[in-house]
Swiss-Prot record:
Protein name (Swiss-Prot/TrEMBL): DNA repair protein RecO
Key word Nucleus present: no
Stated role: Involved in DNA repair and RecF pathway recombination.
Gene3D superfamilies given in the database record: Nucleic acid-binding proteins (2.40.50.140), Recombination protein O, C-terminal domain (1.20.1440.120)
Protein's organism: Clostridium novyi (strain NT)
Superkingdom in the source lineage: Bacteria
Alphabetized Pfam families for the sequence: RecO_C, RecO_N
Keyword line: DNA damage, DNA recombination, DNA repair
Length: 256
């Protein structure tokens, strides 16, 4: 298990999900800064006087002291940095928080470490908490960062067929994850609007912090969502479910 860490170590981590285990314990899935996604046991976490009650709630972010056992990690100590429990009082923020956690659970292998992705993940939670950015733009930006970090990066600047710089296109290759120039055959992909292509290109190369500067219509947001939903569905073994009902309700609002 792991790669070169001591049997007991401290790492920043956020809880992705929990599951009751035996009479008094919990299984906790964490996205950690040092070793990526892991599952750990929190012994006694279900007891009313447990020191782990608050620190084993979904979305809790803190410094976790983990012990590496033969087949499972265990949580020894926790210092909470931010519980992010305020996200639970708003349907939008709880849905997107759950979605970000679900993406990590689906996209990352056990102990697949990526510190840059971890930073973007935690930043996304602070943007959710402060509602300092359009949540759909935040989600699309994080999706693009995740796809890139897990080996499914795009090239919106150069043609994915011939490698020449793209001046203008609205065609995406499903196989090669990128734009196709006007000189190359357009097969095995699909057309999108020029506006949606521009949004994808901007969000892909910008930082999470700067994504808020772009203004996007609801129509283009919906188009970009469908594009990335398709790529996420084909890239990973499971399709995330957290946004499906939520987006159905949102689309109903737009159409009223």
């Amino acid at each position: 298990m792991g790669d070169g860490f001591l049997s007991i170590f401290k790492t920043k981590a956020l809880i992705l999900k929990t599951q009751d285990y035996k009479e008094n314990d919990k299984l906790v899935w964490l996205f950690t800064e040092k070793i990526g996604k892991v599952c750990a046991i929190a012994k006694g976490a279900k007891k009313s006087k447990s020191k782990f009650i608050a620190s084993t709630q979904t979305f809790c972010f803190g410094e976790y002291v983990l012990y590496r056992g033969k087949s499972l990690y265990s949580i020894n100590e926790v210092e909470i940095i931010d519980s992010f429990q305020s996200l639970l009082s708003d349907m939008d923020t709880i849905t997107y928080g759950s979605y970000f956690c679900e993406l990590i659970l689906i996209a990352l292998e056990q102990e697949q470490s990526d510190r840059e992705l971890f930073k973007d993940f935690i930043k996304s939670f602070y943007f959710l908490k402060n509602q300092a950015m359009d949540l759909e733009i935040l989600a699309r930006t994080f999706e693009l960062k995740l796809l890139k970090a897990t080996g499914y990066g795009f090239d919106f600047e150069k043609c994915c067929i011939c490698g020449k710089r793209i001046n203008k296109t609205n065609y995406l290759s499903i196989q090669y994850y990128g734009g196709v120039c006007d000189n190359c055959e357009k097969t095995g992909g699909f057309k999108i609007s020029y506006a949606a292509y521009g949004v994808l290109k901007f969000l892909y190369k910008t930082s999470i912090e700067n994504a808020h500067i772009i203004s996007v219509s609801n129509e283009i947001k919906e188009e970009v969502y469908k594009v990335l939903d398709m790529f996420i569905s084909q890239s990973y073994s499971k399709k995330p479910k957290s946004l499906e009902i939520f987006n159905y309700l949102k689309r109903s609002e737009y159409n009223e």
